[in-house]
Design a protein with these regions (language model features):
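Alpha-helix N-cap/helix-start motif at helix boundaries, enriched for small hydrophobics
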Residues: 117-118, 126-134, 215, 228
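N-terminal core-binding DNA-recognition domain of tyrosine recombinases/integrases
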Residues: 3-91
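Active-site/catalytic core of tyrosine-dependent DNA strand-transfer enzymes
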Residues: 160-203
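Short, basic (Lys/Arg/His-rich) helix/loop patches that form interaction surfaces
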Residues: 194-230, 234
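DNA breakage-rejoining catalytic core of tyrosine-based enzymes
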Residues: 78, 88-104, 152-161
């Protein structure tokens, strides 16, 4: 079976030396795990091992192995055409880690509360619970900042001119989101957010997904992980390490 790697690479025209070495390494590692007799079971074992690698490496290895499996099938070395798939968790991470165009969030909506919730999350990285606890006196219009008080800790976040314009009309209230002077429940917030995201065609997103979009935008702007952690109210950067 191992000699099949050399034969496979010989048929790969136009590959650079580095690319051939990469193919060879991935395929030898593949055979080390599945053994000389390829089966559905051995492939599942290999596929489970893929989750230990970064997503980019997983995609490369799956592509190389699928090409090799097809080559073996064509040559009659294996009687079944097997095909590996990217681990589900990797697919999920891939989707969640994609920087999305959310410019439509600034457009009018039939769900204005859900819209503002979404903007506060994606622009400032706030949690729904933090947003619902916000009082209008936490907003300083003159200095364009927002004060977050949580668990005896305070953090100050800068407000963009656009976001400030969204908050100004609410300054006569006690809370940013309230009914008869009392804050809305978390369930209400999630319903409003869900309805807004569905309206804008992002029904697969959630508050957590929007918070990740904030992180991705910060990284795109070359903001240091420690500074991002500070903005999010995190004590360490541990949960942000995957974005390095």
């Amino acid at each position: 079976m191992r000699e099949g790697i050399s034969a496979f690479l010989e048929e790969k025209q136009g590959l650079s030396v580095n690319s051939k070495q990469s193919y060879k390494y991935d395929l030898e590692q593949f055979l080390d795990l599945v053994g000389e007799r390829i089966s559905e079971t051995s492939l599942k074992i290999y596929q489970a091992q893929l989750s230990n690698f970064k997503i980019s490496a997983q995609k490369r290895k799956v592509s190389a192995c699928n090409q090799f499996l097809y080559f073996l099938y064509q040559k009659g070395e294996i009687g079944t055409f097997y095909r590996l798939e990217l681990p589900k968790q990797a697919e999920k991470k891939q989707v969640q880690s994609e920087l999305l165009d959310l410019s439509s969030f600034w457009q009018e909506s039939a769900y204005p509360e859900g819209r503002l919730l979404a903007l506060l999350i994606v622009e400032l990285g706030l949690l729904p619970s933090e947003i619902l606890a916000l009082k209008t006196n936490d907003v300083n219009l003159d200095f364009q900042v927002l004060r977050i008080n949580k668990a005896s800790q305070q953090r100050i976040l800068s407000l963009s001119t656009n976001l400030l314009g969204e908050l100004e009309p609410l300054m006569g209230q006690t809370y940013l989101f309230e009914k008869a002077g009392k804050p809305y429940s978390r369930q209400w917030a999630f319903r409003q957010l869900e309805a807004f995201l569905k309206e804008k065609g992002f029904s697969d997103l959630s508050a957590q997904g929007l918070r990740e979009q904030f992180i991705l935008r910060q990284i795109e702007e070359k903001v240091d992980l420690y500074e991002i952690a500070k903005k999010l109210g995190l004590k360490t950067v541990m949960t942000l390490e995957k974005y390095r």
